[in-house]
Amino acid sequence: MMRSLATAFAFGTVLPVPAGGRGPMGRGAMTALPVVGLALGALAAAVAWGGAVVFGRSSPLGGLLAVAALLLITRGLHIDGVADTADGLGCYGPPDRARAVMRDGSTGPFGVAAVVVVVMAQALAFSALAAGRPVPVGVAVAVFAGRVAAVLACRRTVPAAAGSSLGATVAGSQPATVAAAWVAVLLGMSLVAGPRPWHGPVAVLLGLGCGGVLVRHCVRRFGGISGDVLGAAIELTATVSAVALAALVRV
């Protein structure tokens, strides 16, 4: 278990993990990925809270700095998946052509637009959540939800896209019990994410639902999931969860 956790941190962050303490990315590391999400969520919440203290609760700078911190500590790994997946979905060719577009090193207009929307939506939502609560638990819950979405995307019935090395190692690797357990933990944490107990669960379920729709569409479009699809699902789920929660706390 510790080896899988170390592998998950080595994969999902820039934190130095000794080579001897980690293994290849696979089933165990994917199961442990939400733990990485908890750590990243705590970091983002702390930065957003600090930004609200320094710049004022009405300033969006705290949320923007929180997103920047996440991009730095994850090497932009998942946001790159957003760009590649958007470009692939924007291609009107057959699945093999769409997969080739995703593997291309350049970023097209769909990818650029998707990244801008995700970054700005997360930044503004994080700022709103930090302004509305003494401790922005909602920020941490949204980031955590994104990593839970990755586990759901790798459940037993989901295939890997042809030519995807990461997809081949993690697609279909997660039993339903593991996915259900992480969803239960997420829902439990989300109970304290908003002023009312139902705010958090509604927001994260909406986020997970949107992430699930994206994964299903990508399976139809690309023939399965890849590392880029997982990254896009993570970011979409986190974004929708944060935006929905920011809207609900004002109800």
Swiss-Prot record:
<dbReference type="GO" id="GO:0008818">
    <property type="term" value="F:cobalamin 5'-phosphate synthase activity"/>
</dbReference>
<keyword id="KW-0812">Transmembrane</keyword>
<dbReference type="GO" id="GO:0009236">
    <property type="term" value="P:cobalamin biosynthetic process"/>
</dbReference>
<keyword id="KW-0460">Magnesium</keyword>
<feature type="transmembrane region" description="Helical">
    <location>
        <begin position="134"/>
        <end position="154"/>
    </location>
</feature>
<feature type="transmembrane region" description="Helical">
    <location>
        <begin position="175"/>
        <end position="195"/>
    </location>
</feature>
<keyword id="KW-1133">Transmembrane helix</keyword>
<dbReference type="InterPro" id="IPR003805">
    <property type="entry name" value="CobS"/>
</dbReference>
<keyword id="KW-0472">Membrane</keyword>
<comment type="pathway">
    <text>Cofactor biosynthesis; adenosylcobalamin biosynthesis; adenosylcobalamin from cob(II)yrinate a,c-diamide: step 7/7.</text>
</comment>
<keyword id="KW-0169">Cobalamin biosynthesis</keyword>
<dbReference type="Pfam" id="PF02654">
    <property type="entry name" value="CobS"/>
</dbReference>
<dbReference type="GO" id="GO:0005886">
    <property type="term" value="C:plasma membrane"/>
</dbReference>
<protein>
    <recommendedName>
        <fullName>Adenosylcobinamide-GDP ribazoletransferase</fullName>
        <ecNumber>2.7.8.26</ecNumber>
    </recommendedName>
</protein>
<feature type="transmembrane region" description="Helical">
    <location>
        <begin position="199"/>
        <end position="219"/>
    </location>
</feature>
<comment type="function">
    <text>Joins adenosylcobinamide-GDP and alpha-ribazole to generate adenosylcobalamin (Ado-cobalamin). Also synthesizes adenosylcobalamin 5'-phosphate from adenosylcobinamide-GDP and alpha-ribazole 5'-phosphate.</text>
</comment>
<feature type="transmembrane region" description="Helical">
    <location>
        <begin position="59"/>
        <end position="79"/>
    </location>
</feature>
<keyword id="KW-1003">Cell membrane</keyword>
<feature type="transmembrane region" description="Helical">
    <location>
        <begin position="110"/>
        <end position="130"/>
    </location>
</feature>
<feature type="transmembrane region" description="Helical">
    <location>
        <begin position="35"/>
        <end position="55"/>
    </location>
</feature>
<keyword id="KW-0808">Transferase</keyword>
<comment type="similarity">
    <text>Belongs to the CobS family.</text>
</comment>
<dbReference type="GO" id="GO:0051073">
    <property type="term" value="F:adenosylcobinamide-GDP ribazoletransferase activity"/>
</dbReference>
<feature type="transmembrane region" description="Helical">
    <location>
        <begin position="229"/>
        <end position="249"/>
    </location>
</feature>
